[in-house]
Amino acid sequence: MLRITATQIDEMIAHVRAEAPNEGCGMLGGTDGSVLAVFPARNAAASPIRFTIHPEDLLHIVRTVEYERDWQILGIFHSHIASPAYPSATDVAEAEFDMGDGELAERYPGAVHVVISLANPAEPDVRGYTIRQREIGAVPLQVVPDTV
């Protein structure tokens, strides 16, 4: 389960809408399964059907999350412009890499893959998944109150 606020979901949706017609992307930082900050990123692929977090943004986010704040990368988010909020074959293929011996390793170990569908722009659909060994598993997103 990933705990996230409605405000953070709205931040992700606003970012991916602003990136349309290309996929939008970013990362989620926090601790103990609770998102503490949303980190929008540029899509280096500049594509409506795939995303790659821009290397400069990735470096900045990882430094901020892991070194400055002592948090973890809890999730990676991206949009699907015209398809459901479910990992595509490309998403699955790019979530892991071959270690050279046929063993697959996650690019972002333990991170939840959050997919935001903009197929119905008035009602974006936001869902979470794990992708491990090319298998997709649903991860509940628990919407929690904003802290003051």
Describe every region a protein language model picked out.
Residues I76:
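Conserved, mostly hydrophobic/aromatic
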Residues M1-I73, I81-V148:
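Conserved beta-strand-loop surface patch within small alpha/beta domains used
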